Amino acid sequence: MKSDIEIAQSVPLKPITEIVKKVGIDADDLELYGNYKAKLSFEKIKSVEDNKPGKLILVTAINPTPAGEGKSTMSIGLADALTKIGKKTMLALREPSLGPVMGIKGGAAGGGYAQVLPMEDINLHFTGDMHAITTAHNALSALIDNHLQQGNELGIDPRRIIWKRVLDLNDRSLRQVIVGLGSPVNGVPREDGFDITVASEVMAILCLATDLKDLKARLANIVIAYRYDKSPVYVRDLKVEGALALILKDAIKPNLVQTIYGTPAFVHGGPFANIAHGCNSVLATSTALRLADYTVTEAGFGADLGAEKFLNIKTPNLPKAPDAVVIVATLRALKMHGGVAKADLTFENTAAVRSGFANLKRHVENIRKFNIPIVVAINEFVTDTKAEIQVLKELCAEIAVPVELASVWAKGADGGIALANAVVKAITEESAAYKRLYADKDSLEEKLKAIVTEIYGGRAVQFGPKAKNQLKQFAQFGWDQLPVCMAKTQYSFSDDPSLLGAPDQFDITIRELVPKTGAGFIVALTGDVMTMPGLPKIPAAMKMDVTEDGTAVGLF
């Protein structure tokens, strides 16, 4: 079987100008980056704002194994299958971060015969959005340090600057650094650190902004530090939101590419779902809804993280809520949740499937709390057995959730036809009546309790000393009206990555709250989640190369 990159490189690409005609986009509406990538103009986005939105399908998953469960691949395959059965369809995905591409993932543009192309470009520098976000973020850091050096008119306490620098790489050695060393001309010495770009609030803002005006307003509202009197300092106090928006003026425009099957795809924005809100840009999703009859999008990691954040943070900023949710499950992940060791996942074990089903069942129950129709997609692997598949289908029938086998990795659009028909049926026969899990007026404690008890199945929320003080402080500043964004391990419902399945009788401990007032949410840090990842012992980068003619090797 060919590798993902071999499959991608074997597909003859069509000019992007031809691909986007399917959804009413003309060549004049595009800003081209070569023949196969483009950004959509503000003029076109504005011209479709009054169009009635089509159907929205959110793809999520059970708690994943370290290898992932093929959610992006399933999203792409489902979109292609919808196209194949005659539906006018668009895809709206996140763009990959170079850190994980070089680290453990090796690529994030789908897989097999369900990929977005050109995959090498998408996985590397693409249209430069990540670099623009990194530059805007670090420009703000430079402006803060310059303000300190030039007299500190705002009275910023250098010990209480909460704006770290960022880099789109996994580099654990930069988590904590000292800046300003050497001499007085090098600035004010202080503690600093680096996060990965996809954890940046600038990334979150870009993905939640509805236009340039909204982008600038959100940038102005970023909290960067506290004064000596402990009052917050905002970007608007530095008067640099215009400069930051200028750096991002092209990055905010959604990127257009194509799938192997020729479905038009927006690939734009890429916040992580374990340390950020995990969804592609509002601008891309909203525009896709107004151009196509069906839009397929995804939210990162399992439904306890990405889907919860999509429904509580992103959906209020969209023209409409999802009409259906697809939960991707794999038998290998269910067996792992059922207690099987990673080395034994290829062996048949129906008992472990039954035991691990508790994880999938809780995700189904959680999405039902939002009143949205659900379809379970079994992402098929060659090691799956008929007996295991039959058991899973029977278990899904017991909780009255439709389930379909999908083999889009191996068969592309053809492998997703049954799933596409099931999703259309769910949308047609059931009506979504979306409701949020909590209200804006609820306190931060109430919002966190709702997520922990209703979504995670936990017993209670515990607050560390720092978080306790921040709850009082944030309420005084009026930030308690914002939604919450949990920073938590993706592998478990709990904050313990080793606690698999559907655990209960556990508490979640919030160690720190981080204000993301520009993005419009409060991040709650749990466990030992890092906002700057490290590289594994054998990084994917060690298998990458480029040939003398410029052909990429080793991406997957």
Curated annotation (Swiss-Prot):
Gene3D superfamilies registered for this protein in UniProt: Domain 2, N(10)-formyltetrahydrofolate synthetase, Formyltetrahydrofolate synthetase, domain 3, P-loop containing nucleotide triphosphate hydrolases
Pathway(s) this gene product operates in, as recorded in its UniProt entry: One-carbon metabolism; tetrahydrofolate interconversion
EC number: 6.3.4.3
GO molecular function, one term: ATP binding
Highest taxon in the source lineage: Bacteria
PROSITE patterns per UniProt: FTHFS_1, FTHFS_2
Entries under InterPro entries matching the protein: Formate_THF_ligase, Formate_THF_ligase_CS, P-loop_NTPase
Catalyses which reaction(s): (6S)-5,6,7,8-tetrahydrofolate + formate + ATP = (6R)-10-formyltetrahydrofolate + ADP + phosphate
Residues annotated for ATP binding in this entry: 65-72
Ligase among keywords: yes
GO biological process, any: tetrahydrofolate interconversion
Keyword terms, alphabetized: ATP-binding, Ligase, Nucleotide-binding, One-carbon metabolism
Family membership noted in the UniProt record: Belongs to the formate--tetrahydrofolate ligase family.
Stated name of the protein: Formate--tetrahydrofolate ligase
Taxon lineage: Bacteria, Bacillati, Bacillota, Bacilli, Lactobacillales
